């Protein structure tokens, strides 16, 4: 069984009669009020913003409290912390409302009102606490008054790691919007339709079936003869209806995008060539078209020519000159389709296999269980790849550390060449990435402008989109010129890196010659040796003096140890005088 791609075409709607929606779908309003919780924090030198959670009000309005459920804050790590939120709108002290708002969120003092995370292991939202946690995986942030108009314009708060911290680590923004509720099935179908359109555009660039294919819009593809997955599946749906299949309410028609879209099905008898058929251009119509083989019938029902008579139940016995296939039929000869067959008896083509066939879309009918098992395969564990080149670099570094001159030179040259190649690849990848991002931003800007114009038309009686939402109007500032300038700079750098390797120029001086590459690795060892030779005499002289001094002291101690110094008369007189002074 062929494995379908994830872009399975859920087009059984063309097979089934219109489904009458239930009362719940009819009574449910298509629009709803939705709260958004955004967190903004600084990571290094980059400012990041992420949507932590969303929650919808009741279908008939925001008349009761709502609660956000989310796993964690991005700027506060779970564990050694107690997240605390401070809002400006609910402060009671003037210092908290009027000062330190930009840096501290209105809370540099202990008397400001803070919403500290409270432990709630029962996971029951309490009215008395704004921020709670189950202590393990989930935080609960409650909005007690969702009907207040402040949420429409947006409320900003500061996030602290601890209640005693002086400065916040992130910023929270809560706002309320009126959105259109799209069922999940329709949302999935919209995503699949976008993917199908993208696949059709890729295929149309490869299939040159129209001289002006780039100028044909998506709606005119069927008339222009371009390939379309939608048209293909519609033909398959018609065949299913003609076959009389019933009870297909939970089945899916799928096609594999990696396989040919059409398959040739052998017909049980020859074409009727007596009638007048529409003239078709001569020559090969298509190549490499697979042939369907019925596993229950080992032989083909009918063949015009065959290399082996056992392959076919019946073989054509008439003349094979100037045969034309009617509308919807083709001659299949060795994976090639043609509308005309002209084979003589002595022609080598008479020994090939030629069949009357009809083209059928290559679709597969899956049940819901089969599709779930095919679209969601089991996860595979990733295996680590052993990188031997890393070991080679480590060995080379070891040789350099050991002082092997040849190894050091080879490592230096190979590392320089590898660094140059990687730098060129990085610049080329950066240029391509910037160009791709610029194209995406320009496309998004065009789509946003079209949506803005459509919204202004729909809300013209209410003063436009901005007046209807009560917000300031935002406009897109096109700064694509900066990106284009950066791309030109990267291109110049890339050309400069390529130029020395293709057209070397050694006229700049002796330091730019190839000999410099061989001399540089020897400079450091030579300098170290010269330094050692300069200080070696001083070191040797110092060591010699110290050895002599130690030897002299040792000899004196050994020779004069049995002797002691005798007292003299002067010494005796000095002792007597000292005793007299002490007696006084």
Swiss-Prot record:
Entry-linked Pfam families: TLV_coat
Chain residue ranges for the region called Fusion peptide: 388-413
Residues carrying sugar: 69, 247, 272, 276, 308, 313, 322, 334, 342, 346, 478
Alphabetical list of SUPFAM superfamilies matching this protein: Virus ectodomain
Extracellular side: 23-514
Residue stretches spanning the membrane: 515-540
Protein modification: Specific enzymatic cleavages in vivo yield the mature SU and TM proteins.
Motif (CXXC): 251-254
Chain location of the short sequence motif CX6CC per the record: 466-474
Site positions for Cleavage: 383-384
Main location: virion
Compartment(s) where it occurs, according to its Swiss-Prot or TrEMBL record: Virion
Presence of keyword Protein transport: no
Signal peptide: 1-22
Disulfide bonds: 466-473
Keyword Protein biosynthesis among record annotations: no
GO cellular component, one term: plasma membrane
Keywords attached to this entry: Cell membrane, Cleavage on pair of basic residues, Disulfide bond, ERV, Glycoprotein, Membrane, Signal, Transmembrane, Transmembrane helix, Transposable element, Viral envelope protein, Virion
Gene3D superfamilies referenced in this protein's UniProt entry, alphabetically: 1.10.287.210
CDD domains for this protein: HTLV-1-like_HR1-HR2
Complexes and interactors: The surface (SU) and transmembrane (TM) proteins form a heterodimer. SU and TM are attached by noncovalent interactions or by a labile interchain disulfide bond.
Protein family according to the UniProt entry: Belongs to the gamma type-C retroviral envelope protein family. HERV class-I F(c)1 env subfamily.
More info: Ortholog of the human HERV-F(c)1_Xq21.33 envelope protein.
Name of the protein in its database record: Endogenous retrovirus group FC1 Env polyprotein
Protein species of origin: Pan troglodytes (Chimpanzee)
């Amino acid at each position: 069984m062929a494995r379908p791609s994830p872009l399975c075409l859920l087009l059984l709607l063309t097979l089934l009669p219109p489904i009458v929606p239930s009362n719940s779908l009819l009574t449910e309003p298509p629009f709803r009020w939705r709260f958004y919780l955004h967190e903004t924090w600084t990571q290094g030198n980059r400012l990041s913003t992420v949507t932590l959670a969303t929650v919808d009000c009741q279908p008939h309005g925001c008349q009761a409290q709502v609660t956000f459920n989310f796993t964690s804050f991005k700027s506060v790590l779970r564990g050694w912390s107690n997240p605390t939120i401070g809002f400006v709108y609910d402060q009671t002290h003037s210092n908290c409302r009027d000062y330190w708002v930009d840096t501290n969120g209105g809370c540099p003092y202990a008397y400001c009102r803070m919403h500290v995370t409270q432990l709630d292991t029962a996971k029951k939202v309490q009215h008395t606490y704004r921020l709670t946690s189950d202590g393990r995986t989930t935080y609960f942030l409650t909005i007690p008054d969702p009907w207040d108009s402040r949420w429409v314009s947006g409320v900003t708060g500061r996030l602290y790691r601890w209640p005693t911290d002086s400065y916040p680590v992130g910023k929270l923004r809560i706002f309320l919007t009126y959105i259109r509720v799209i069922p999940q099935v329709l949302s999935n179908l919209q995503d699949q339709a976008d993917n199908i359109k993208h696949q059709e555009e890729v295929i149309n660039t490869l299939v040159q079936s129209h001289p002006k294919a780039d100028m044909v819009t998506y709606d005119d593809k069927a008339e222009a003869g371009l390939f379309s997955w939608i048209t293909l599946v519609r033909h398959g749906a018609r065949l299913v209806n003609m076959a009389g299949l019933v009870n297909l309410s939970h089945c899916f028609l799928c096609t594999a995008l990696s396989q040919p879209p059409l398959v040739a099905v052998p017909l049980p008898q020859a074409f009727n060539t007596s009638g007048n058929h529409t003239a078709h251009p001569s020559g090969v119509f298509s190549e490499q078209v697979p042939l369907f083989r019925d596993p229950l019938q080992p032989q083909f029902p009918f063949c015009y020519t065959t290399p082996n008579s056992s392959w076919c139940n019946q073989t054509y016995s008439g003349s094979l000159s100037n045969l034309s296939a009617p509308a919807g039929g083709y001659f299949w000869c060795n994976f090639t389709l043609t509308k005309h067959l002209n084979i003589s008896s002595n022609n080598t083509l008479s020994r090939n296999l030629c069949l009357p066939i009809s083209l059928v879309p290559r679709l597969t009918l899956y049940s819901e269980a089969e599709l779930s098992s095919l679209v969601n395969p089991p996860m595979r564990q990733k295996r680590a790849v052993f990188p031997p080149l890393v070991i080679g670099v480590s060995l080379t570094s070891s040789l350099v550390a050991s002082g092997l001159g040849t190894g050091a030179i080879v490592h230096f040259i190979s590392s320089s060449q590898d660094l140059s190649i990687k730098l060129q690849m990085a610049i080329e990848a950066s240029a391509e990435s910037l160009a791709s991002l610029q194209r995406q931003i320009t496309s998004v800007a065009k789509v946003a402008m079209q949506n803005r114009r459509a919204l202004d038309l729909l809300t013209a009686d209410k003063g436009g989109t901005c007046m209807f939402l009560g917000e300031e109007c935002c406009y897109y500032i096109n700064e694509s010129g900066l990106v284009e300038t950066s791309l030109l700079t990267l291109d110049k750098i890339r050309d400069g890196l390529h130029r020395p390797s293709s057209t070397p120029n050694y006229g700049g001086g002796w330091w730019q010659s190839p000999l410099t590459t061989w001399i540089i690795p020897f400079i450091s060892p030579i300098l170290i040796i010269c330094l050692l030779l300069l200080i070696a005499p001083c070191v040797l002289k110092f060591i010699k003096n110290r050895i002599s001094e130690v030897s002299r002291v040792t000899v004196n101690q050994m020779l004069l140890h049995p002797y002691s110094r005798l007292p003299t008369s002067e010494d005796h007189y000095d002792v007597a005088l000292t005793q007299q002074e002490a007696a006084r």
